Swiss-Prot record:
It is an enzyme of class 1 (oxidoreductase). This is Probable NADH-dependent butanol dehydrogenase 1. Pathway: Alcohol metabolism; butanol biosynthesis. Keywords: NAD, Oxidoreductase. InterPro entries: ADH_Fe/GldA, ADH_Fe_C, ADH_Fe_CS, BDH-like. It comes from Bacillus subtilis (strain 168). It comes from the Bacteria. Its EC number is 1.1.1.-. The keyword Transcription regulation does not apply. GO terms for biological process: 1-butanol biosynthetic process. One of its GO terms (cellular component) is cytosol. GO terms for molecular function: alcohol dehydrogenase (NADP+) activity; butanol dehydrogenase (NAD+) activity; metal ion binding; methylglyoxal reductase (NADPH) (acetol producing) activity.
Amino acid sequence: MQNFTYWNPTKLIFGRGEVERLPEELKPYGKNVLLVYGGGSIKRSGLYDQVIEQLNKAGATVHELAGVEPNPRVSTVNKGVAICKEQNIDFLLAVGGGSVIDCTKAIAAGAKYDGDAWDIVTKKHQPKDALPFGTVLTLAATGSEMNSGSVITNWETKEKYGWGSPLVFPKFSILDPVNTFTVPKNHTIYGMVDMMSHVFEQYFHHVSNTPYQDRMCESLLRTVIETAPKLINDLENYELRETILYTGTIALNGMLSMGARGDWATHNIEHAVSAVYDIPHAGGLAILFPNWMRHTLSENPARMKQLAVRVFDVEEAGKTDEEIALEGIDKLSAFWTSLGAPNRLADYDINDEQLDTIADKAMANGTFGQFKSLNKEDVLSILKASL
């Protein structure tokens, strides 16, 4: 294992009806609150009214930033920052999925900075302070409710980058599976692809002696594989929603990567794709990940074989490690397709016209990837295989 320090200060509040804990959780942070949410689904589901009721009980003055995009824009972040400064906001409350939470993290840091929030995203400025914030989660997917990472898009420059700071861990996150009942089938599928992709990014490394980390990753993957087909046919099943909600959080709260840094190359490529074409993040991952795996297989066939055998139950007899690994990759792709996820860029009407532009954006900070360091030719090869 590699040396590591694990620290995660987010209080996780999980279960039915736990939004009623809001007044108590808000007490340490002040009463001037900015409520951040997306396109209005929380109003249709009734969650908005529940949250407002609890904020009123807390005696909070509520300001709102609505309309956070699925790939949150820095322009929206800057709107939130302006509200925070004009209204002397004490606390931010993100009610939504990962995009809303990611946007809120950037607002929290940007509110304590005099420049453009894009400076924080591009790491030109390292945050020295941030407003406190909490979350009420409505989508099992990103794990942003219990980590310090965020992904923000600049639509004007067609750039999309991940950033993070220990200052932007949520103070608390409230996870009620009931609040995910109204998530439509396609977004439920995307969420499960996303959390599996997070596990894969942490699974693919060359560090020796990580048996427990490996088994945690494999257990999470098998749990999603077992649960997903049931859930997409029973969207209001509490226990199935509960399982996936918890799994999504554990997939990216830092536990899986203790002692072994993961890869994250596929996410970097997908960020470049969705910066140009604004496609769903997890849809891009479903297309790219199997092709990244095929492209990098020769780096560590034993690792890919282990995944194929332990997670996808590939039979070993009479096959080479590479054949076993490739069968596992095919099973992954087939599984995602069976759920309804896309498997070609053509599914989003993406052709080869802008592949070079996408590759250049992926290479903005030079070669990347821990499992295999990718250059532009590698990226183009993966993109072409994904058409």
